[in-house]
Amino acid sequence: MHIKTLTVSQLNRYVKNTLDADFILNNASVKGEISNLKIHSSGHIYFSLKDGGSKINCVMFKSYAYNLKFALENGMDVVALGNVSVYEKEGSYQLYVKDMKREGIGDLYVAFEKLKEKLKEEGLFDDAHKKEIPKFSKKIGVITSPTGAAIKDIINVTKRRNKGIELLIYPALVQGTDASKTLIEGIKTLNKVEDVDIIILARGGGSIEELWAFNNEELAYAVYNSKKPIITGVGHETDFTIIDFVSDRRAPTPSAAAEIAAFDREVLINEILNYKYNIKNSMENIIKEKRNYLNLYKQKIEANSPTNIIANEYRNIDNLKELLNMKIEGKLNKEKNNLSRLSSLLEAHNPLNVLKKGYTLIEDEGNNLITEKEALKELNKINIIFKDGRAKLSIKYIEEF
């Protein structure tokens, strides 16, 4: 007995709604092997998950794929988290994946975090223990695979920055069971080379299993106990290993490690030239400033030197002498004029000038001028003064007018 006849679309929608309402299918965690992997240009990822007996189609949209911590590959065992639903257009159900993790990787992460916490408590990560990276290394020791991309990158970067730096390469395994041992041996060997300034411990990117050799406890202690500073450049920027926390400097890539270890010769030359230029300018400015001070003090010294003081005093004396002469001359001229005026005045009142007109002067014997006849009565002798001489006379008589 049929309850209702449905269209294909109605059937697919009904199945979709039924699946979407199921709690388990909406919180599915599915383990399987990746196959038919396709990464679309839009960023969406399409693939299948399979096991020994079956498979299911999967899709992971770009917004979720962006947060993946590892690159997907066919044959990779994963655990996919998401929800099962129907693609109505095709009538097929598939797993819509929201997150994914590597199958079996969980145990490695637990071991990683456990060792990390242990070494942290023991002080291997303390900044106080980290050695200073030398600025001008002449010889760099490199521990890595002699055939990998890492050593090529390190060589290229070092040659580009400074062809004068020598690289001493210790060939080591960088993954596998014996890798940690060869890395430890490399550290010990390069520590014995006296002129090695710094060590780079490096390898290219890889999965957590491929990088696991760098999460070894003995290797961590070898890095910690190294007398020479160690830069680690393991994997890509997002990859962190135990020795990255122990090393003196962690670089995101092998190339970046070489950038840190090898100083750029051209940059150094330019810096030296800039320092030289700045020092030259500074010295010229200092010399100019001191010369100005010197000239100023020289002027002050010259202005206050005994020679200049004496010369100034001589000039002052000459000026005073000239002024004195002028004043004396002026005073003499003034007095001369006064004398001339008084002489003229005296000359005008000189009694002798009257005598030139025919007059005479009468004096007694005491040279006292006699102006009245009464004075003659008591005198016997008088002096008569002429314009050109004098005569002594005796008085015989006095006649009244």
From Swiss-Prot:
One of its GO terms (cellular component) is exodeoxyribonuclease VII complex. Its EC number is 3.1.11.6. This is Exodeoxyribonuclease 7 large subunit. Belongs to the XseA family. GO terms for biological process: DNA catabolic process. Bidirectionally degrades single-stranded DNA into large acid-insoluble oligonucleotides, which are then degraded further into small acid-soluble oligonucleotides. It is found in: Cytoplasm. It is an enzyme of class 3 (hydrolase). The gene is xseA. The keyword Hydrolase applies. It comes from the Bacteria. Transmembrane segments: none annotated. It catalyses: Exonucleolytic cleavage in either 5'- to 3'- or 3'- to 5'-direction to yield nucleoside 5'-phosphates. Heterooligomer composed of large and small subunits. Keywords: Cytoplasm, Exonuclease, Hydrolase, Nuclease. InterPro entries: Exonuc_VII_L, Exonuc_VII_lsu_C, OB-fold_nuc-bd_dom.
